[in-house]
Amino acid sequence: MKMTMMCDESIEENNKSSTVELNHNEKDGRIHSIIINFHPITHEQSNNQFYIQTLHEILKYIIDKKLNLVHFETRPTLTLSNANRDVQYSCLITLEANEINMSLLYEELRGNSFISGINLLNNQESEDWYPKHISDLDKCQHLLRKFQPELQTDHPGFHDKVYRERREAIAKIAFQYKYGDRIPEVEYTKEEIETWGLVFTKMKAVHASRACREYIDGFQLLEKYCNYNSESIPQLQTICEFMHRTSGFRIRPVAGLVSPKDFLASLAFRVFQCTQYIRHHSRPMHTPEPDCIHELIGHMPMLVNRQFADFSQELGLASLGASEEEITRLSTLYWFTVEFGLCNENGETRALGAGIMSSYGELENAFSDLSVKEPFNINDAAVQVYDDVGYQKIYFVTESIESMKRELRNYINTSGKSTIPIYDPITETVHMKSRFSIRKELLKHVKEEIGQLDTLLNHSNYTLP
């Protein structure tokens, strides 16, 4: 028999190990894991009452101390080979708590006569931290320095002191920005506006022949409501407010290329980290790093689309609490979809990736015989090697955004994880929940929807077609 512990403290038998999450505030905590081994339970012990009582006591202690219970799993670890078929159980608990509370819990467990052993696993280091509330994104600004103009001798701005100083001045806006602030405006120079205008005009001319329908629709909305034109560079706050009304996404300024872990974590909260600086004027049609032109011309038209915004968020959610290897696979998926994805549309190949739609050279490469086009397969795309400096050698072609979402969900659901991050749009928080509790909540939601439909049909003259 295996036990399922639920938040309402009910207990039910099933044939799978399972989990429970409770959420309480515990400041200054770190993640700790404990394996608890129990004395064997004999066949004669009615309903395993002593084991069940101990589990209740452990949960009650955690609740009373207001510890954040991340994961709770029980399973039989050993069936003793004797006539009575005695069973030994173990319990895995993952908590967010400070060192003092963990010591107190350890002493409490040691005093329980039904526990045979306690194994404290190595504490997870700070890199295992992930944001729980949208305000935690203030901590997700770890920059990758590989493309900084002051460090890379082949960067077009390396020998341009004025350009480097300009980049530093704009970067200060991002470093000073905090959750809840309005995004400060940047007064762009004539040279920066001219660079923007060159790319804007060049790329808009190929929309009809190369861009997917979702991109074109989004771009036209931005022209209408966010002052997209070749004569001025739109401000992030204006785009942020409009995008939040259309797809629920927001923007926060960033000083440069952030780490994949921090960038994906932002997407989980429907937040896009966006640069405000403009690429060097000497190379307007290609940039070695994300810049405002890449973000505004490449990404924003697609993020206005609700389906594509959902896909981006689901990628981000999958990254929370993931290992470094999983982060690498997810960021590679992002690269071959959101950045450099192609799609089929009415029998034609069209571009949906921001890296293609913000770089004329990349667009030419994507639609030439110099690159390979493969049907999108999520398992292949997740491990495909790519070039983060030059033009891509391979692109993946998806059937639609919806099919891309389906593949991503299947990919996540087959990961084998017992807990899944769930975003609450009302409180703008993320909670780790077991698959069991998610199914339970979904069933409850479906019942409520059916009830509303039943009420609507019973109190109106409407009849089903």
Swiss-Prot record:
A Gene Ontology biological process annotation?
aromatic amino acid metabolic process
Provide the Gene Ontology terms for cellular component. Answer: axon; perikaryon; perinuclear region of cytoplasm
Q: Which residues bind Fe cation?
A: 294, 299, 339
Signal sequence annotation: none
Keywords of the record, alphabetical order, are:
Catecholamine biosynthesis, Cytoplasm, Iron, Metal-binding, Monooxygenase, Neurotransmitter biosynthesis, Oxidoreductase
Q: Which reaction does it catalyse?
A: (6R)-L-erythro-5,6,7,8-tetrahydrobiopterin + L-tyrosine + O2 = (4aS,6R)-4a-hydroxy-L-erythro-5,6,7,8-tetrahydrobiopterin + L-dopa
| Subcellular location field | Cytoplasm, Perinuclear region
Q: In which pathway does it act?
A: Catecholamine biosynthesis; dopamine biosynthesis; dopamine from L-tyrosine: step 1/2
Offer an example of a GO molecular function term for this protein: tyrosine 3-monooxygenase activity
Q: Which cofactor does it need?
A: Fe(2+)
Looking up Pfam families in the UniProt record yields: Biopterin_H
Class of the enzyme per the UniProt entry, highest EC level:
oxidoreductase
Enzyme Commission number(s): 1.14.16.2
What the record says about family reads: Belongs to the biopterin-dependent aromatic amino acid hydroxylase family.
NCBIfam families in the record, alphabetically?
Answer: Tyr_3_monoox (TIGR01269)
Name listed for the protein in its UniProt record: Tyrosine 3-monooxygenase
The scientific name of the source species is Schistosoma mansoni (Blood fluke)
